[in-house]
From Swiss-Prot:
NAD(+) binds at D79, G80, N153, E154, D183, T194, A195, Y196, S197, L198, S199, A218, N252. The active site is at D79. It is found in: Cytoplasm. Its cofactor is a divalent metal cation. Involved in the regulation of the intracellular balance of NAD and NADP, and is a key enzyme in the biosynthesis of NADP. Catalyzes specifically the phosphorylation on 2'-hydroxyl of the adenosine moiety of NAD to yield NADP. This is NAD kinase 2. It catalyses: NAD(+) + ATP = ADP + NADP(+) + H(+). The keyword Zinc does not apply. It comes from the Bacteria. The lineage of its organism: Bacteria, Bacillati, Cyanobacteriota, Cyanophyceae, Synechococcales. GO terms for molecular function: ATP binding; metal ion binding; NAD binding; NAD+ kinase activity.
Length: 302
């Protein structure tokens, strides 16, 4: 029986393209039908933010042939490629093996140094799945959905250059609205807590916590701090600013948000299924990638 596998490649990087060819050859020798696509298919409106209306919704990012019959998909690229690939695979419930050919590789499971071993493990079925929560980010105007995307890391809504500070009214479930004056706001998943939100002063959240994090960007108040709340609460952001704002999702999807729009964020029924080839200890990843918990002064060897 012929099995089916996906290959999602950052085709703008020569190293990823070259590696993809060798991975595809190895899979085909193991009786896999390989469907190879570009990770650019997961980028939503990023290059053309004026192209606002996307009536088909976020499931339109899933490539042809990526369905329930696919055993897994291998992602070749950096963290940005993984974020794009998440939109291409999560709605179809396809597990992904992330192989880093980029820089930091915070979301990577394997590297070029252990590529052959990783491919052997995935072919023999020697792997587990870790699920990560996603949000659905929708731009609404009255009752019309004007734009929508799946979000693994964060949604950032902020001012354009050379414009003044922004004002937001944020509604969280049935709670009283929150008013924030800042350069922007970030709403992140636990996975995204180590990305843009961390740089803006938000806390690190372990991936298994069912929460949302709201982090202001350069707030104009000493009392304005990051807020963490249950992810069962839908969030609506109302821009109270006369100028248009820029919304960016996961660093590679986005559009303009106008004063008459509102941004709705809610937990998605689709999660990203990461393939784990070995024990994935989160604190160890923090230590290795971000230097968390390292001593400030080197200790002498015994």
């Amino acid at each position: 029986m012929v099995l089916k596998a996906g290959l999602i490649v950052n085709d703008g990087k020569e190293l990823a393209v070259q590696t993809a060819s060798s991975v595809q050859e190895k899979l085909e020798k193991s009786n896999y039908e390989v469907i190879r696509v570009s990770s650019s298919g997961g980028m939503v409106g990023f290059a053309n933010p004026d192209q606002h209306v996307r009536p088909l919704g976020y499931t339109n990012c899933v490539p042809e042939g990526f369905d329930s019959s696919m055993e897994f998909a291998i992602v070749l690229g950096g963290d940005g490629t993984v974020l794009s690939a998440a939109r291409q695979t999560a709605p179809a419930k396809i597990p992904i093996l992330t192989i880093n050919t980029g820089h930091l590789g915070f979301l990577a499971e394997a590297y070029l140094s252990n590529l052959n071993e990783a491919i052997d493990k995935i072919i023999t079925g020697n792997w587990d799945i870790e699920e990560r929560t996603c949000f659905i980010v929708s731009v609404m105007r009255n009752d019309q959905r004007r734009w929508e995307s799946l979000c693994l890391n964060e949604m950032a809504l902020h001012r354009e250059p050379l414009t003044s500070m922004c004002h937001f009214e944020i509604s969280i479930g049935r709670h009283a609205p929150v008013d924030i004056s800042a350069d922007g706001v970030i709403l992140s998943t636990p996975t995204g807590s180590t990305a843009y939100s961390l740089s803006a002063g938000g806390p690190v959240i372990t991936p298994d916590c069912p929460v949302v994090q709201l982090t202001p960007i350069a707030p104009h108040s000493l009392a304005s701090r990051a807020l963490v709340f249950n992810d069962s609460e839908p969030v609506t952001v109302f821009p109270a600013t006369p100028e248009r704002l820029v919304m960016v999702v996961d660093g590679n999807a986005g559009c303009y948000v106008w004063p008459e729009d509102r941004v709705l964020i809610r937990k998605s029924k689709h999660s990203v299924k990461f393939i784990r080839l070995e024990d994935h200890e989160f604190f160890q990843v923090l230590r290795n990638k971000l230097g968390w918990g390292l001593p400030h002064v080197a200790k002498p060897n015994k």
